[in-house]
A protein has these predicted regions:
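Feature for intrinsically disordered/low-complexity regulatory segments and propeptides
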Residues: 1-62, 68
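Functionally constrained cores in energy, signaling, and assembly domains
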Residues: 35, 39, 44, 85-86, ...
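Intrinsically disordered, low-complexity regions enriched in serine/threonine
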Residues: 1-21, 76-79, 93-282
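A short acidic/basic microdomain associated with nuclease active sites
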Residues: 66-98
Length: 282
């Protein structure tokens, strides 16, 4: 009888494929994390810090994702790794092309695919995080659904990878519900001065001015609605080059991936802000 072997959704990036062991630090209350492949220190953390290595985390999350989705939903999956802090911080961005929803305004139609984001840090730079979102197929803007569509567990002494996988298995968010919300946004006109609105939401004159220019571009394509404004936000968090004028400073540090992720969190805060939410119920 042949074995029932489920194909992998992804292979872990080669640079992350190592184990971790710990050695005492000369600083009381701390320990060194040692990369078992290179035998070099990769972290300096509190003795109460507890985490698994990257392969254990990401493949464990994969198991949970596969367990609550239909086989056809997992076909042609697209994955992208973002890695920084000398491989101590890693993010896996998964897009499911076969899970999609059309968003239509009076001027434009686009398709949104489901997105799953997994973050992991072995040096205390981030918690164990799984988030759910989407990706706008028209412009490939990445979406995070906000603070309620996530699973987050800190690397404290009580952290259990087994429990995290169990929670992730039952935490699948309703993608259709997310997209129905986006459709409402596409049907909701912006009943405010966009420039003044951005000043209230962004709270940075320089950033607000550049965001206004980006919002005008999105409005010209999608119409003057709340989804167009949201698309301007997600453009900012998806790109950092001449396409949108929001380039990152070249600091010479290994932090660009983390900086772009911080932008996504910033956008989630803007969407949850009172000025944005007030216009949705006006």
């Amino acid at each position: 009888m042949p074995f029932d072997v489920t194909p992998r959704l992804f292979e872990i990036d080669e640079s992350l494929n190592y184990g971790i062991r710990y050695e005492p630090s000369r600083l009381s209350g701390y320990k060194f994390g040692i990369n078992t492949m290179t035998d070099k220190a990769c972290s300096h953390v509190s003795n109460t810090f507890k985490c698994v290595d990257h392969p254990t985390y990401f493949y464990g999350c994969e198991e949970a994702i596969v367990s609550n989705r239909e086989p056809h939903e997992l076909e042609d999956v697209k994955v992208k790794w973002r890695i920084c802090r000398d491989t101590a911080w890693a993010m896996l961005d998964i897009t499911l092309p076969n899970v999609s929803y059309k968003i239509t305004s009076d001027k434009h139609q686009t398709e949104v695919n489901e997105r799953i984001i997994l973050l992991h840090g072995i040096d205390g730079s981030c918690s164990n995080i799984a988030l759910f979102g989407g990706i706008d197929f028209f412009c490939t803007n990445k979406q995070v659904r906000g603070k309620y569509a996530q699973l987050k567990k800190k690397n404290t002494s009580g952290f259990s990878m087994e429990n995290f996988i169990s929670d992730l298995t039952t935490a699948r968010q309703d993608f259709d519900e997310h997209c129905r919300m986006l459709q409402v946004w596409a049907e909701t006109p912006i009943k405010a001065n966009v420039r003044l609105l951005l000043d209230k939401i962004v709270k940075s004159e320089r950033l607000s001015k550049k965001m206004y220019s980006l919002a005008q571009q999105e409005i010209s394509k999608r119409g003057k609605n709340m989804y167009a404004l949201y698309s301007a936000f997600t453009n900012y968090s998806s790109y950092a080059d001449e396409r949108n004028g929001f380039s990152l400073r070249n600091t010479g540090n290994d932090t660009q991936a983390q900086s772009m992720w911080n932008r996504e969190q910033q956008v989630a805060q803007w969407v949850d802000s009172k000025p944005f939410q007030d216009l949705l119920v006006a």
